Amino acid sequence: MRGFAWGWSTDCLGTDISNLDKMADESAAKYENDYAHLDGDGIYFQTFTETDKETIGGKLIADAAVEMVNKAAAKILDKHPDLKIQFGLHATSVHDKLEYIKNVDERVTILWEDCGTFPYTYIPKMQGDFDETLAFTQKIKNLRSGGFGTLFKGMSVLDWGTFKHQPGTYIIGEHSKKKIADKLEEKRKYWKYLQAYWLSNAQYVKKIVEILDSSTLVSALVEDGVFDEKVWFPVAVYSEILWNPNRNIDKIMTEAALIPAAYFA
């Protein structure tokens, strides 16, 4: 699975959506020129939905996004009918415009994020109305016949202040022992903070997962957290919930703590 942006960079509101045909053509061409030859089984993309505004330049984001996505997906799937396409959709800009989103090409799986309070938030505190978040998840789950997925957060994230795109091919995970140890200690402090709230609020992750169908694509962001060195406790808890959410939360937490590789910050 490979990922790239369709029609935007880092500022949705600065995106020009006046020519959706051109945007769709460019997105399809980028796949054809840069990714098709790599023989991946699928692609993940985001477009101009990561904002709390409903419009860009007077155009409704939900309507424009669906039009552009369907055009680009059709062009790609015409040549690559077996390709899996995942659409990373931010609910913040389309929350009240689901009548448009239901028209996304059924061959495209929508991976929803920013759908309310935790587990859709970066910090695993319970801020907001969980019952409303649960109800919205139920609504989008049944919105359309195409693939459905959720993206949970509340774990480590990229430091966007220092982030840079890789300029080319590179070897993953090759650092000195000192570099790894220093990074581990840096991230341990962050994981300790997250871990405290997972201990209190993992039950809400369980409640969301319990209402999802077995066919749901359930994903989570674990970014820049030295995950390749340690399986941090929140990740272990999340994994146990996915494995079988139909258990008492205390049982799930205990099983996660007993995982040999699980690490407490």
Positions of the model-derived regions?
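Catalytic-core regions of glycoside hydrolase
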Residues: 1-264
